């Protein structure tokens, strides 16, 4: 089997393999040529052996390459009260960072 890891970033968990392209919540400012390193590795399977952290695995990291900034789908929140002429519409688009997973280090 192909090695994979479970990482945590932005209070979400992602199962990643080398070569995967994922969108994670914006991590602040990242230069266009920068490498992104995820330190919170919860689980690693290297093809033969599984390693489980409690809560994270010490010295394990996942290296990724920055690709671009993207925006998610628009989410619309609408409040309405009948017969009172009260309605509020609010929209939101979450900003994401698109990264390509390069390698998983244990």
UniProtKB/Swiss-Prot annotation:
Record-linked InterPro entries: bL21-like, bL21-like_sf, Ribosomal_bL21, Ribosomal_bL21_CS
GO cellular component annotations of the record: cytoplasm; ribonucleoprotein complex; ribosome
Keyword Protease set for record: no
Any single Pfam family the record assigns to this protein: Ribosomal_L21p
One GO MF term attached to the UniProt entry: structural constituent of ribosome
The entry's keywords: Ribonucleoprotein, Ribosomal protein, RNA-binding, rRNA-binding
GO terms of biological process kind: translation
Subunit structure as annotated in this protein's UniProt entry: Part of the 50S ribosomal subunit. Contacts protein L20.
Function statement: This protein binds to 23S rRNA in the presence of protein L20.
PANTHER family cross-referenced by the UniProt entry: 50S RIBOSOMAL PROTEIN L21, LARGE RIBOSOMAL SUBUNIT PROTEIN BL21M
NCBIfam families recorded: L21
Family per similarity comment: Belongs to the bacterial ribosomal protein bL21 family.
UniProt protein name: Large ribosomal subunit protein bL21
Organism: Chlamydia pneumoniae
């Amino acid at each position: 089997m192909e090695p994979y890891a479970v990482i945590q970033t932005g209070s979400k968990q992602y199962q990643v393999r080398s070569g995967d392209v994922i969108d994670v919540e914006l991590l602040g400012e990242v230069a266009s040529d920068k490498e992104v390193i995820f330190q919170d590795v919860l689980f690693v399977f290297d093809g033969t052996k599984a390693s489980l952290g409690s809560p994270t695995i010490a010295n394990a990291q996942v290296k990724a390459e920055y690709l671009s900034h993207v925006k998610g789908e628009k989410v619309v929140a609408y409040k309405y009260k009948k017969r009172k002429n009260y309605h509020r519409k609010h929209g939101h688009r979450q900003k994401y960072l698109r990264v390509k997973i390069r390698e998983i280090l244990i």
